[in-house]
Amino acid sequence: MLAFHFTTLQKAESEYNYFIVNNLKNLRKVFNIENLKWELLEDESENQSGNIYWFNLSYDHSSGEGSYLYRMEPNTKSKAHHHTGPEEFFILEGDLTDSDGYLYKKGDFVQLSSGSSHYSTTKNGCTSVVTHRGKYIYSEE
């Protein structure tokens, strides 16, 4: 009886794996940074010389969770904001200076804990991948 049950489980697992592999194309999204239609992030771009753009990968405004691409033009400053959950970002190109003066550069992966507050500036422009696990709230600097 145990051998029959084990064989049945193996068969079910095999069928599941076959389904996943053969349906992977229906479960996959691919974005190439060279071919994106960036959107102006108006809340961040108002009242400053440089603009900030984003491309939503999976960010959900209602939960504050997910990922997006974030691009700042040279000599731009983001608005100050507070994080209700952790934020992580990976610098793909350019430079980014946090409000405490810490300079991030291409290749840096940054983790900010829940409860952090900051704004960022860039001298040469910056493109990053950002992931939030909680909402961010604009604040006074």
Give the positions of each predicted feature.
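Ligand-binding loop in jelly-roll beta-barrel domains
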Residues: 114-138
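Conserved short histidine dyad/triad with adjacent acidic residue
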Residues: 53-83, 114
